[in-house]
Regions:
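A structural "flexibility-hinge" signal
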Residues: 1-190
Length: 190
């Protein structure tokens, strides 16, 4: 399995970047930069959530249900006429669950780092979150994952698949630089 940043460089990743950029009405290179920052942060936050039995059970249920990877089967249709509001609403729910009250802080920091305004970042994240869940769901199916106990390892492989220890440490710092569970102050130190 390759890492999440490797995915962005693949043909699928390029389709995702192009589609998200078109749907959000943002510059493709800035959208790519935003996703390069955001997706590993979201994966790391998912991994942390999956570290608790309740979090792992909830994520496993989502991956076995709505987020089974089928969204990836028709990205052209997803992006073709603009992303449906239902997809954005689902993305907002995912972000709220994964990031909680840290969501706006993460959006603000990614905005500052990418050069896109916070509203554009929020839109990019809402569109990409269900796609990211689809990527995770597809991988869990390929791995025949039936137990929520295996989730943390799989998510770690997505994050660590890039073979960048420094990058992993950076992600951990983003999510908890102050040791207080706060993402906002941690992302600010990027």
């Amino acid at each position: 399995m390759s890492g999440i940043l490797d995915l962005l460089g693949s043909n699928l990743g390029k389709s995702i970047i192009s589609g998200v950029s078109g749907s959000a009405g943002t510059d493709e290179s800035k959208t790519s930069a935003a996703l390069t920052m955001a997706l590993p942060v979201l994966m790391t936050a998912m991994k942390r959530n999956a570290a608790t039995p309740k979090g792992a059970e909830g994520l496993m249920g989502a991956l076995n249900g709505k987020h089974d990877g089928s969204i990836l089967d028709n990205l052209g249709g997803l992006f073709g006429g603009g992303v449906d509001d239902n997809v954005k609403q689902e993305g907002d729910k995912i972000l709220s669950h994964v990031l909680g009250d840290k969501q706006s802080g993460v959006e603000k920091i990614i905005s500052e780092k990418s050069g896109l305004d916070a509203a554009s970042i929020a839109n990019i994240l809402k569109i990409s979150a269900p796609i990211l869940m689809g990527v995770v769901g597809r991988q869990s199916k390929q791995d025949n994952m039936n137990s929520s106990g295996d989730l943390s390892g799989m998510l770690g492989n997505f994050i660590g698949g890039n073979d960048m220890k420094e990058e992993q440490n950076f992600l951990e710092k983003i999510l908890d630089a102050g040791g207080d569970g706060s993402v906002v102050d941690d992302v600010a130190s990027m």
